[in-house]
UniProtKB/Swiss-Prot annotation:
One of its GO terms (cellular component) is plasma membrane. GO terms for molecular function: NADH dehydrogenase activity; oxidoreductase activity, acting on NAD(P)H, quinone or similar compound as acceptor; quinone binding. GO terms for biological process: aerobic respiration. This is NADH-quinone oxidoreductase subunit H. Coiled coil: none annotated. Pfam families: NADHdh. Belongs to the complex I subunit 1 family. The gene is nuoH. It catalyses: a quinone + NADH + 5 H(+)(in) = a quinol + NAD(+) + 4 H(+)(out). Its EC number is 7.1.1.-. It is an enzyme of class 7 (translocase). The chain crosses the membrane at residues 62-82, 96-116, 127-147, 163-183, 202-222, 238-257, 264-286, 299-319, 339-359. NCBIfam families: PRK06076.1-2, PRK06076.1-3. The lineage of its organism: Bacteria, Pseudomonadati, Pseudomonadota, Gammaproteobacteria, Lysobacterales.
Length: 363
């Protein structure tokens, strides 16, 4: 299946390159659109899936109208885009407009180094992991700017909560990725996946030797995206919508889009760092060449990556429907007193496992 997709892309790439410098620019723009458009469409269907799944958990139907609920998210998008963006009279006008853009831009830029397969990646950067850490850290600036520019105590309180929470859990996430870097010997995302390849299937994935780091990264990813049960930033019972309380229309839609794009991104990164990315869980167990349409089941391919991502994206919804919101002090305690010490200890354990050959870096 991967070969079939690449056979469609390569001739198109060569045709654009044949147009000269202008063709190279157009090809770059096309690659950006090939990332942005699917992300936007995926967010729309993800919202529908969230409503449906929570509806089933509540023993109700969920969205049933507008194409059996499938197109309800698109209807919501059009509704928000055609609504007026009301700016408070006391707000800082320029900063108020820049804030949602500053939140959305890093959420989309991070996708440029995410590999969907061995050859399906926009930019196979050698420092992809460091680039991701930088991009995912920039989003908090838009949130802080929104809270300050709104000139509202509720928005500012939500922004301050977000800043403290994101900074706290970024440290734990960064330490967890140090363990991944030690185990793989690389900061290139494709090389991290290749380091988990082998003839033992899922036993070669980093999920098993780095299981504590996997849990830390997963939970920290939920906290990083301000989702339940770590959604004190938008605590409805306390500060309404937090930093977004003064936003409406298209500006609110940009914040909404950035949040869900980050949720999907975290699901991708967990799958790449700990579950072998596009690798098959039975890789090495079956050696057969039958058809490109089914060989990916044991050879690996982007469908495996999408299935793993679907699981973690659905887990976000499960967390929201199942767990009560943490208090702010409990969130800080979990990040600083539990996750950071745990990751530091397991970094040392990972180094020892690599030194004594317990972790093998691919085949």
């Amino acid at each position: 299946m991967n070969e079939l997709l690449l056979n469609l892309v390569d001739p198109l790439h060569q045709w654009f390159l044949g147009l000269g410098d202008g063709g190279a620019v157009l090809w770059s723009v096309l690659k950006i659109l090939l990332i942005a458009v699917p992300v936007i469409v995926t967010v729309a269907f993800y919202v529908v899936w969230e409503r449906k799944l929570i509806g089933w958990m509540h023993v109700r139907h969920g969205p049933m109208y507008v194409g059996m609920g499938i197109f309800q998210a698109f209807a919501d998008v059009f509704k928000l885009l055609f609504k007026e963006i009301v700016q408070p009279a006391s707000s800082h006008k320029a900063m108020f407009v820049i804030a949602p853009l500053l939140t959305l831009a890093p959420a989309f830029a991070a996708w440029s180094v995410v590999p969907f397969d061995a050859k399906l990646v926009l930019s196979n950067a050698n420092v992809g992991l460091l680039y991701l850490l930088a991009m995912t850290s920039l989003g908090v600036y838009g949130i802080i700017l929104a809270g300050w520019a709104s000139n509202s105590k509720y928005a500012f309180l939500g922004a301050m909560r977000s800043a403290a929470q994101v900074v706290s859990y970024e440290i734990a996430m960064g330490f967890a990725l140090v363990g991944v870097m030690i185990a793989s010997g690389s900061v290139n995302l494709s090389q991290i996946v290749f380091a988990q390849a082998g003839n033992s299937g899922f036993f070669d994935w980093f999920l098993i030797p780095l299981f504590p780091l996997f849990i830390v990264y997963w939970v920290s990813g939920v906290a990083e995206t301000n989702r339940a049960p770590f959604d004190v930033v938008e605590g409805e019972s306390e500060i309404v919508a937090g930093h977004m309380v003064e936003y409406s229309g298209g500006a609110f839609a940009l914040f909404f889009l950035a949040e869900y794009a980050n949720m999907i991104l975290v699901s991708f990164l967990i799958s790449i760092f700990f579950l072998g990315g596009w690798l098959s869980p039975i890789q090495g167990w079956v050696n057969a060449d039958i058809s490109p349409w089914i060989d990916w089941l044991w050879k690996g391919g982007w469908p495996w990556l999408l299935m793993k991502v679907f699981f973690f994206a659905s887990a976000y919804i499960w967390f929201r429907a199942s767990f009560p919101r943490y208090r702010y002090d409990q969130i800080m305690r979990l990040g600083w007193k539990v996750f950071i010490p745990l990751t530091i200890v397991w970094i040392a354990v990972t180094a020892l496992m690599v030194f004594y050959g317990v972790i093998q870096k691919g085949v």
